[in-house]
């Protein structure tokens, strides 16, 4: 796997800055993260923006769906009262040359915009597009086979081996509770890599890395890097 997702900051450095904002991604760089994970939705006018919740109530205090706002409207809001919602292009531009990027697509309909942003920034070799939605991963691969995709999952089922094969994924991203030695052996047998989420405990991170996962996603890359010695 050419991209480096060994230590991936979840939504940047979500424990330290307003999640999925530019300050959070810059903090991940300061922490020594090798990559960041982010979430993408389309605005009403088709702009790929970086935000975890479609309903913006928790993050901005405004009861609105980001998919029903224009980008101009969404950009006026402040995440946790601190920073604005960035576009995917802004985050990719900031990450280029600094970080690999795990782009989680939360909802179908933004795949083309994601692919175009990755192409424009020349970052196909530095990104991994992930989703719980197989059709989204399939759409990304059809638009640009050079962009790697990864299958997100919470609980393991062997059907995910077939899903990974059908969408052309070389990476699966199970929740850490699903990771077992048997699972990792199955994945290696199919030529698949594993990145796991969301790991905030140093002891757990050491165990998972010792078992052979290729990367851990964490809310606090500063603390985990120091504690585990990454």
Q: Predicted segments — roles?
A:
Residues 1-230:
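Phosphate-group recognition and catalysis centered on beta-loop-alpha active-site segments
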């Amino acid at each position: 796997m050419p991209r480096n997702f060994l230590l991936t900051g979840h939504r940047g450095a979500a424990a330290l800055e307003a999640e999925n904002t530019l300050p959070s991604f810059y903090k991940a760089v300061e922490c020594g993260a090798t990559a960041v994970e982010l979430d993408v939705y389309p605005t009403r006018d088709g702009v790929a923006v970086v935000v975890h919740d479609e309903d913006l109530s928790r993050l901005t205090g405004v009861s609105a769906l980001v998919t029903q706002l224009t980008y101009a409207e969404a950009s006026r809001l402040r995440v946790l009262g601190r920073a604005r919602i960035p576009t995917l292009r802004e985050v990719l531009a900031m990450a280029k040359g600094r970080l690999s990027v795990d782009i989680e697509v939360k909802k179908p309909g933004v795949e083309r915009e994601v692919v175009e942003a990755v192409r424009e920034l020349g970052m196909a070799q530095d990104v991994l597009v992930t989703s719980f939605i197989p059709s989204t991963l399939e759409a990304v691969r059809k638009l640009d086979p050079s962009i790697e995709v990864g299958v997100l999952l919470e609980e393991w089922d062997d059907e995910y081996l077939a899903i990974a094969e059908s969408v052309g994924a070389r990476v699966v991203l199970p929740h850490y509770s699903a990771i077992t030695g048997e699972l990792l052996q199955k994945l290696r047998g199919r030529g698949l890599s594993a990145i796991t989420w969301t790991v905030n405990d140093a002891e757990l991170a050491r165990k998972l890395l010792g078992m052979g996962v290729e990367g851990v996603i964490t809310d606090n890359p500063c603390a985990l890097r120091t504690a585990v010695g990454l």
